[in-house]
Every structure is written in structure tokens, then in C-alpha cells.
Amino acid sequence: MKVGQVIAVVDIGSTKVCCCIASVDEHEHFDILGVGYCVCFGVKHGIIIDMDLVSKSIARAVEEAEKAANLRIKSVYVNASGKFVRSELIHSSINIGGRIVRHEDVKKLIYKSIKKNPKEEIIHSIPILFEMDSMVCTTDPIGMFSNVLNANVNVVTIPKVQINNIIVSLARCHLDVLGVVYSGYAAGLCVLNEDSNQENQIVIDFGGGVTTINFFYKGRFCGLETIPFGADNITRDIACGIRVSNLNAERLKTLHGAAFVSFDDKKNMILVPMQEENNVINLQQMPKSDLNEIIQPRVEEILKLIKEKIDKSVFKCDFANNFIITGGGSMLTGIREFVSETLKKSVKVQKMEDFSENFGIQIENDFATAIGMIKFALLSDDINLNHKDDSEKNDDIGFLKKTMSWLENNL
């Protein structure tokens, strides 16, 4: 990308919509120009269920980011998440004939791995490991001699109806879609550094409505698992258990909540805004233990499901020790220790960097997906089928282009 080129992304989550606008610097990195944030309604477990509400949330977040950046945006990268996102490792093979492997060979191999499905849209196709003549394994075969080139390709798909709803929601805000990025992949791109290219790691993204388990083989996204519970479930448990509004439940969780009950919690008193008759708010004291006794069972449930998913995964043996947690739920006090105890592994909470000192804000962990999408747009070596040359598109793979054309003519 050219220096000064603008990248805009929209992260549509179950609890918030985030818009980030960035520009490319001379070092092929980026500076954040503006951030917009809005509470999101109309999304459940990462899936849009009310397009009108979602579009309004997107519009507010984009407007806020545009004001901060002092510019208007027309096109964005957007995320996709939810339990219907699928990841499949597909083996593919082509004959090279003893010559040097070229970039075109790798593309041909990846395209060969794609299975046509009229109901699914491919959003990522990522080569994980190449094998040459059944002997040499490498992550980059280009420039090497081979007779036969094999590859395991991670193909990530999403139902076309789901991606269509995302595109229409953005089109209602007069925004075109440049590309769709799986949320867990983006979160991993955000928190993994260059050293990660030598390691196998699991990135657990604690979102609002969905928790995802994302497997990275030497920096390459190779698999995913999804749990339809997240930090918002904890908030609703608090609201129900203490009988406060969701807004006050979120504040209590943020200010006083912890993943487990500690010894001193019964001694520590907190103020709880209880709503009485006639909508009068009355502050009442409550032991901190009462709050955390509500939080702990839900955290235990989510972590139990995470452990079950990992234990059943084909990647279990290869990803034994390296765990990173991120997302809004990772900011809950004590979550690292609780995850480590449950999984019996060393766990790291990856703190986000302040990506733009000039912007004057600290980017928190719940912005990991948005920052990862900027990295995807800037640096990704993933072959995104939504950006292929027209000569290489077929009817299935060109779904996004056809959808956008339909929207332009009908909205």
C-alpha cells in the first residue's frame, strides 16, 4: 500500500460496533486516525438478527470515527463471526514437473482445494504447510525445485445469507465492502508478533456474545472452534441475579467483578444502584463476594466448554503450551489465572499496544479484532478470494462482487 493510504474497518460485535480509520506510514505500518464506538443492538452470538438496529449502530460508530479522523470513508473491511463460520483443512496436490515452484503454482494449488458450495461463501483460503515430493515440508516453497507439490489449506467459509446481511447493513450506511475477515483470525493477527512465526499458538478471543478458539501454526491461521457464550452472558447474569439494569451490571462487572471469589471478597463492600418503585435509584451496600459468586459459575461454564473443544481438536498435540487470551472478556480480573488453572497451561493476556501516541488514547483489548483487520488489509499473505483477478473468478467465488452489484442497483 502507498504511504498515506487510508484503511477503514468496521467490527460488528454482539455488544458493540467499532470503526477504526488508519493511514499507512513510511515504514509499512499504520497510524490510527480515528476511532468510533457505539453500543450494538440487533446482533446475537455474532449474527445479525435486526438489520435496522445494526445499521444505526454502524452509522453512529462510523460518524464518530470520521469526526475524529476529519475525513469521510466510502469503503471498509468488515468482520464475520458466529457459530456458522466453518474452518476445514483440505489437502490438495499438483504436478510441478521438476521445475522451480512459482507463485502461480501456489495460487493454482490453493484454488484447487476449494470445494464449491452454493450456500457458503469462502472468506479465507490459507496455505498452512507445503510438502514437496513427499519429503520436504515448508511454509514457503516458492523458488524450490519439486516434482509434486502438496499442501494443507485452511478454507474458512460463512453462510452466504449471513454475509449478505452484513453487506446490506453496511450499504444502508453508504459503505462498500472491500473484504470480509473472520473475527478470530483478525484477533490473532493483532496479538501475535513476529516471534509467533516460529511457534504454534492458541488465541482465545473472549467476545461479547461469542468466544472463539483460534489455532495458529507458525503464525498461520489453521483452525477454529466457536462457543456461543461470551462476556455479555456474564453481564446478563449479574443483571438478573442482583436485579439491576444491563448498563449497571456492566459497570459492576468492570469496576468490581472478578473471575472467581477470593477470600477477602466477603469483607469488601461495594455500592449497587438498585432500582426501586417509581424508577428511583437507591444505592445499597453489598459484599463483593455476592457479585463474584454470580460471575464465577458462568466463567467456569465457558472455560469448561473451551477445554472440551481443545481436547477434541485435531490440533491438541501440536498446541500444547502456548495460549494467549484477548477480547473484551480478557479484561476481567483474574481471568488469566482461572484459564491457566482450568487448562493446566501457561496463559498470557496479550495487552494491546497504544497504536497511535498522537491519537492520545489507549486501545483496549476489545478493539483487538478491529486492529487485526487493519493488519490484515496491510500485511496479510492470505489469498482472499474476494480480491482475485476477474479472469480467475467463477460464479461461486464472485458472490461478493455480484451481491454488491445487486445492492447498487436496488438500494
Language model feature labels by segment:
Residues A80-K83, G208, G327-G328:
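Core structural elements
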Residues T15, I158, G257-F260, D318-T342:
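Glycine-rich phosphate-binding loops at beta-strand->alpha-helix junctions
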Residues R236, S289, E293, P297-K304, ...:
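Feature representing long, continuous alpha-helical segments
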